[in-house]
A protein has these predicted regions:
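Conserved ABC ATPase signature
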Residues: 133-138, 142-144
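A short, proline-enriched helix->beta-strand linker immediately N-terminal to the Walker B motif
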Residues: 153-157
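Helix-to-loop junction immediately C-terminal to a conserved catalytic motif
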Residues: 49
Length: 228
């Protein structure tokens, strides 16, 4: 599913955010990526959907070598990946339905198929009754549910979640985690960067810890391992 072999990422300012990364992630796994702020977690996950390109080494996702992927090929590659952000990144002038449908309209799906699929995923995230609302009319938890619906509407094999509970209260964070669990149980691989100690220590999955651009710990059903 995902393979990194001797991956380095050095930025123009001289910072090395990935320092010899090697990892294999199987289809259907749920991975927490943890570590101190500035450790290289975001770079690690961004290289999986070519938001960042490795300076050297090999990054394979769904059988595609991202190191050799041309820029014009990136949008097509990303159709099999859903991304969930901490700050939701919804289009403020579009309704809930339109935000989720947008991903399918871009790839020119038939309107009838779009409507059916969008309503299916909104039912899954519990927002079928709010299809006509704008993001500004929703709570933070509801906005994150829309973001998750948008990320799965293409039926991706992989979801990358960057601090998906970071802006949410504890109760809402648990709701979002249970939703991600449900999606994972259907066979979707989830890679989630997080600082949420309680979530990692309670809902057990594989834990990959990154410090100074290196993987320092990789444990099945691991703990968060940091204070706070």
């Amino acid at each position: 599913m995902i393979e990194m072999q001797d991956v380095y990422k050095k930025y123009p300012n001289g910072i090395t955010a990935a320092n010899g990364l090697n990892i294999h992630i199987k289809q259907g796994e749920f991975i927490y990526v943890v570590g101190p702020s500035g450790a290289g977690k975001s770079t690690f996950i961004k290289m999986m959907y070519r938001e960042e390109k490795a300076s050297s080494g090999t990054v394979l996702v769904n059988g595609v070598n991202l190191s050799k992927l041309k820029n014009r090929e990136v949008p097509f590659f990303r159709r099999n990946i859903g991304v969930v952000f901490q700050d939701f990144k919804l289009l403020p002038t579009l309704t809930v339905f339109e935000n989720v449908a947008f991903a399918l309209e871009v790839i020119e799906q038939r309107p009838k198929d779009i409507k059916r699929r969008v309503m299916d995923v909104l039912a899954l995230v519990g927002l079928k009754h709010k299809v006509r609302m704008l993001p500004s009319e929703l709570s933070g938890g509801e906005q994150q549910r829309v973001s998750i619906a948008r990320s799965i509407v293409n039926k991706p094999k992989l979801i990358i979640a960057d601090e998906p509970t970071g802006n949410l209260d504890p109760d809402t964070s648990w709701e979002i985690m249970h939703l991600l669990e449900e999606i994972n149980l259907k066979g979707t691989t989830i890679v989630m960067a997080t600082h949420n100690k309680e979530v990692v220590n309670t809902i057990k999955h594989r834990v990959v810890a990154i410090e100074s651009g290196r993987i320092v710990r990789d444990e099945q059903r691991g703990d968060y391992g940091y204070e706070g």
